Amino acid sequence: FNSIKNIRASSAGKSAPVADEREYRLVRASDGDSFVLKDGNGRTIRVRLYGIDAPESRQPYGKQSKAHLLSLIQNRPLRLKTMYLDNYKRTVSLVYLADKNGIDELSVNQRQVQAGMAWVYDYFCTSDICKTWKLEEAMARKERLGLWQDSDPTPPWQWRREQKKKKK
């Protein structure tokens, strides 16, 4: 965890990040940034990837984003660095692949951004690492990776607002 030692949570009523020594396995994924994990004792937790927002399942590139997430974490041991609990009682975390050699330096969160499978969620991404992620998002956009193949993709937060308006 040396490369992320200085990451701090937003001061908006959130506690400091906590590294979790337990290993987790995927139970199921909802989309490209939310999933359920199980620890070695069989306890499940709902996880939201910190600082990013992936397309919703019914949104363009939603299925691709989820498939990319699954390609990263399915059948792999995972470690969490919890940033905070959100309003939906999800554990908002940096998620890392773990193996016998230790923990991967790059988070799953970062890999989703690098592949063009998620946006950096500026409103919630307040840690120092977010600056790096913004540069990687710009590179993915420039290289037209993932959702950036679309000339003007709709961010999930905007898409959700539009869906709420349609229901009214």
Model-derived regions, located:
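Small beta-barrel nucleic-acid-binding modules, primarily SNase/OB-fold domains
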Residues: F1-K168
